Amino acid sequence: RICYTHKSLQAKTTKSCEGNTCYKMFIRTSREYISERGCGCPTAMWPYQTECCKGDRCNK
């Protein structure tokens, strides 16, 4: 599986991952939207939210 693996304001990067899922973890604050992308499907702790998906580059 090929997943995006970058944080909010960084240039987009991809990585070939062993697992079958990619994730996008994010938090919305009053001033900005912060996100992080990577391989797998980690459990998010409040106030973060995680979206997991299966498919190459699905975590845009």
From Swiss-Prot:
Keyword Disulfide bond attached: yes
General function of this protein: This specific blocker of the L-type calcium channel (Cav1/CACNA1) is a smooth muscle relaxant and an inhibitor of cardiac contractions.
Coiled coil: none
A GO MF label: calcium channel regulator activity
Keywords annotated in UniProt: Calcium channel impairing toxin, Cardiotoxin, Disulfide bond, Ion channel impairing toxin, Secreted, Toxin, Voltage-gated calcium channel impairing toxin
Pfam families with a match to the protein in the record: Toxin_cobra-type
Organ and tissue specificity: Expressed by the venom gland.
Important for binding to L-type calcium channels: annotated span: 41-48
Designated name of the protein: Toxin S4C8
